[in-house]
Amino acid sequence: MASKIASLFSPSETASKDQHENVAEDLELGTASSQSDGIHETNSEYDEKKREESPEVIDISNLISSDHPAHPQNWHWAKRWSIVFMFCLMQIYVIWTSNGFGSIEYSVMAQFNVSAQVATLCLSMNILGSGLGPMFLGPLSDIGGRKPVYFCSIFVYTVFNISCALPRNIVQMIISHFIIGVAGSTALTNVAGGIPDLFPEDTAGVPMSLFVWACAGGAIGAPMATGVDINAKYGWRWLYYINIIVGGFFLIVILIIPETLPIKVITRYENAKGRIVEGIPKNNLKEVLKKCKFVTTMGFRMMLTEPIILSMGLYNFYAYGISYFFLTAIWPVFYDTYKMSEMGASCTYLSGFVASTLLFLYQPIQDWIFRRDKAKNNGVARPEARFTSALFITLLFPAGMFLFAFTCHPPFPWMSPIVGNSMVTVANGHNWMCILNYLTDSYPLLSGSAVAAFTLPSFIGATVFAHVSQIMFNNMSVKWAVATMAFISISIPFIIYTFYFFGQRIRALSSLTGNKALKYLPLENN
């Protein structure tokens, strides 16, 4: 080899000095001709070595597209649906406590010798915590990943169920319920915000409807399951004991389920391929503070500055609160008026299960309507198209309220108010599903934060209605208490029409819709 190298620079060779320099340059660049074979590595070997020494640098903004092979939307359908199914079960689990508390409330009152309003604080603080939690957990999951937030939250949720099962006084129980609400809220934020991680907008409707069905299933099943309260052998504490056992199961499940946040998944994929992704912040104090600022402010910023989120949140302040209003109305109507047993009155919640199942079965039609609108719009999806069916279904909301109000007593059969409640559940559930799809379509990079900003007014409304309903039913007949809310609900269809016809104009005022939000994420180059 030495003789070959020497011969390249020998005076006896006919090559000029310039040729010698060219060959030397070729040797340096790894592109020498066949006469340099054996002197250095082949091109492919050299290129591989250079890639190892100088990894390819890719900007994160080029990797958020669903066209990337590592994007969770490109995973096998069975894997994606398994993840959604497990997370929907988790939503049923965390909603169990707040919706099941009504069935054990009288036992808690007797245990601590407190009034109904004081005992209801356990429920209302749980609801309030469920509204505040997503304001921090939503943004945190948008930058830190879904999986770590899930695990830590469910761990805290499980621990404080122990505190609720073995409280020394009612104050401890109320505080523990608030913390349970905060920790359990991650299921609502992460599932609703995580579905767009796994499904494109054209097919996200069905998994989102499954999530809504899971919410209804938890709300319906909890009062029925906590009917064990009437059995002295088990008692009210078993609501929390069961939560502790199931919580341990979900902690194991979370360890197995993969991360779904696209930026996290794609970055890991590229790093494994030896590429450097620009824009990922380093772990220094400045970047940590930037992340803390994002986590603590983004949810509130979106709620207060995004017109579409603010208007939808105010709508759901009333609409979601109505569901807790009916939780209270069930007992004076079916237990006191129609003389049903406690279990019989609890079983009336099954009407909501039927209504939610019908919504789930209808969702493929809703998706077809959305795709048809997209085709008519030259392949561009309009989030407002999510409300097409709602233009008609939302009319069931006030109609069902009035039916319940004026037929919730003899001589009308007990089935009549159940039908009215079902009509409200169909309209309310469908509107909620449309809004969740609308928000995740409009804010793909901040879906968790958007859902969180939307849910805070919703849970504040539920907190308020949990106490207002107690006052109304104590001072008014059931008929006029529900009728009062029915007259207010007349405005619901007009609000939905506003979203459909003017939503695009309202979205135009936003600085966070679509990929515009990328510059606000706590990335290194922002």
From Swiss-Prot:
Segments passing through the bilayer: 81-101, 118-138, 147-167, 173-192, 204-224, 238-257, 314-330, 349-366, 387-407, 413-432, 444-461, 480-501
Primary location group: membrane
Biased amino acid composition, Basic and acidic residues: 38-53
Spans annotated as Disordered: 1-53
Record's keyword terms, sorted: Membrane, Transmembrane, Transmembrane helix, Transport
Domain of life: Eukaryota
GO cellular component terms attached to this protein's record: fungal-type vacuole; plasma membrane
Ranges in a coiled coil: none
Membrane topology: Multi-pass membrane protein
Listed PANTHER family: MAJOR FACILITATOR SUPERFAMILY (PTHR23502), VITAMIN B6 TRANSPORTER BSU1 (PTHR23502:SF180)
Family indicated by similarity: Belongs to the major facilitator superfamily. CAR1 family.
Described function: Thiamine-regulated, high affinity import carrier of pyridoxine, pyridoxal and pyridoxamine. Also imports, but does not export, amiloride and so confers sensitivity.
Name by which UniProt lists this protein: Vitamin B6 transporter bsu1
